[in-house]
Amino acid sequence: DLYRKDPIERPVSDFSTESLDKIFNVNRGEDSGYADDDIKPLSIKVSGFGGQGVLSAGLTISQAACAEGKHVSWYPSYGPEQRGGKSNCSVVISNETIGTPVVDDIDILIALNKPSLEQFSKDVKVGGTILYDSKIGEFETDKDINVIAMPCVDIAEEHGNARTANTALLGALSELSNVLKRESYENAIREMFVSKPKVIDVNIAVLKAGAEWIKNNS
C-alpha cells in the first residue's frame, strides 16, 4: 500500500529511579548528603516548552548539587512527549533531608517562555529572583522581586547553537546563587554529555558566557 505510513517512533525519556540513580551516582541506602550551616534551602523552578532543555537543565543543577554532597531533589512535570508541550521541573537544594520535592514557594524562577513566566511568577517569594529569556518581552510585577531579562538565546547563538540557551541561564544561576560552585555545573555538563565531547565544549563555553553576562549586567 503506497499510502500506508508506519507510525513515527519517538524516543521515550527514562526518568525511572534506576536511570536517575545512574546519572547521579547514587547508592541506595547510603546518606551521602551532609549538613552545611551556610546553606539555606533553595527552591528552583525551571520552565518552558518541550524541546527547550527544561528537564535537562534541572538535572544539571541536581547533579551539580549531588556531586557536592548536598541534599537535592528533582521533580519533573511535563505534557506529551513532543516539542511544544509544556514542561517544568522543581529542584530543591538543602543542608538537611528534603521533606517534599514539590515547590510551591519559589526562590529562583527560570522561565524560557511567556506562559511559564506568567504561570509561575506569582509563586516566587518576596525577595526572590525571576530569570527569563529577554525575547519574551517586558515583564512587570508588583512584588519585591529581582527580575532579570537575559538574552540567553543570543548568547547561545553567538556560540553556534541556539539550543544551549538553557545553559546560558544556568551560567547566570551560578553567579546569582553561591550555593553551588561553577565548577560543579561544568562537571555536571561533562557527565550529562559524556559521549558527546563537542557538545560539552559548547555548553561549557555558553555556561561561562552566561555567568559573565550576569556579572556585567546585574
Please state what every model-predicted region is:
Residues 2-218:
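Active-site cofactor/cluster-binding pocket
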